[in-house]
């Protein structure tokens, strides 16, 4: 393929499809993580393209913390039914039994129990040797230095000092029994690339990304949407209706919205062209401590 004849987005698309096909051919039991966000929607679209007109030859896995936005779960189930892919949903039973939540256990412990430990449980349960993730290098500094093929040991931990060289488009997927690879087909995409691709390819996304009047409270410098009656107000907090949207989606008590009037894809793209902050600023889990994302990744987080 003549790369010079391809547009920037088509080059990114071709690279991602190449990676997805490479993993499907090279590994015995791959899985695609599906977190329901914009990056997952793009990755799903690329996987469908990679194997069209056939079906995606591996399942999608959602590690459900039980605290996702209701609209996310509705979108997940609707999308799985529409496209007919195999969807696996895992909730950490131990976390559920102890009533783990962002309010009772704090953001760091909740994320470790319900996301990191839940993910490791699911990977062990199904014996996956490769797992696709939608992380991008422009999101956060620890992700910026991670390879496309990210080696994980038998405990699913990551050692950033023990990464394999990736020369040109040659990836080393050699693993021993019990070891695995996390694969990031969107590594070289930016947030703006994602939104432009969604617009050009007409990819469906969770409506929470579009601005609308929503009930929010201001907490710890973030606008937190009140998604259900489990959200307990602190003294002095008042629920307000504001026009907001989300740049990133996670557990609703830990995800901050931004005030915006961008209720169309073109409006979002216009905002991205002048944005000066990272989308991850809206994630409370990234502010637990200095280097918190790298620490979480070392422990097995995506």
Curated annotation (Swiss-Prot):
Assembly notes? Heterodimer composed of CysD, the smaller subunit, and CysN.
Q: What is the lineage of its organism?
A: Bacteria, Pseudomonadati, Pseudomonadota, Gammaproteobacteria, Vibrionales
Q: Which species? A: Vibrio vulnificus (strain YJ016)
The EC number of this protein is: 2.7.7.4
| Alphabetic keyword roster | ATP-binding, Nucleotide-binding, Nucleotidyltransferase, Transferase
Protein family according to the UniProt entry: Belongs to the PAPS reductase family. CysD subfamily.
Q: Which GO terms describe its biological process?
A: hydrogen sulfide biosynthetic process; sulfate assimilation
**Superkingdom in the source lineage:** Bacteria
Report what the protein is called: Sulfate adenylyltransferase subunit 2
